[in-house]
């Protein structure tokens, strides 16, 4: 409910049903990106390559989306503000896990189509975060990481959050 008030978007309460994916907020011209990182137990067609690498976030669209899909074009053209909400697992035992607000993303580049692999810069990436859930998301390392895409990110001068945590 709080999110619907912040974005002046009452349909979030009705329209969002604990699923991953894109949710467009017309009133605020904001796209909310909901991502569950751990894909274990999903069919191979749904094992998208989603993870942080330093202050960059790698995201794969759903397989049905192509580079020319309207929502993907809005992301690439920077038409809407993009806010990432992520969680490691959808459920823990019988409880649905909440999404964590990871902040604003900015499109950087993309590769391939169906699914489209998009690289975002995380505008609100916090090297000094004390939020354990957010740190876990930053450090999440899928076993298939980078298998489907190349990782050509300039990391000069960056301090990895993993370098500060023992």
Residue ranges and their predicted role:
Residues 143-166:
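Short, charged surface segments at domain edges that flank catalytic/cofactor-binding sites
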Residues 1-7, 106, 125, 158, ...:
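Short intrinsically disordered, low-complexity coil segments enriched in acidic
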Residues 91-147:
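Compact mixed alphabeta submodule
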Residues 1-98:
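Acidic, glycine-rich low-complexity segments with interspersed aromatic residues
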């Amino acid at each position: 409910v709080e999110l619907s008030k912040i974005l002046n978007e009452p349909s979030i309460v009705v329209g969002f049903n604990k699923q991953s994916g894109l949710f467009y907020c017309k009133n605020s011209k904001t796209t909310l990106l909901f991502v569950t990182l751990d894909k274990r137990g999903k069919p191979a067609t749904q094992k998208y390559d989603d993870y942080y690498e330093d202050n960059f976030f790698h995201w794969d669209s759903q397989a049905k989306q192509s580079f020319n899909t309207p929502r993907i074009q809005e992301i690439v053209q920077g038409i809407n503000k993009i806010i990432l909400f992520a969680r490691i697992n959808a459920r823990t035992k019988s409880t649905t896990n909440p999404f964590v607000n990871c902040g604003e993303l900015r499109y950087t580049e993309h590769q391939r189509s169906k699914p489209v692999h998009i690289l975002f810069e995380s505008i609100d990436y916090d090297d000094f975060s004390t939020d354990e859930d957010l740190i876990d998301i930053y450090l999440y390392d899928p076993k298939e990481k980078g298998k489907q895409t190349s990782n050509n990110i300039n990391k000069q001068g960056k301090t990895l959050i993993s370098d500060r945590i023992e």
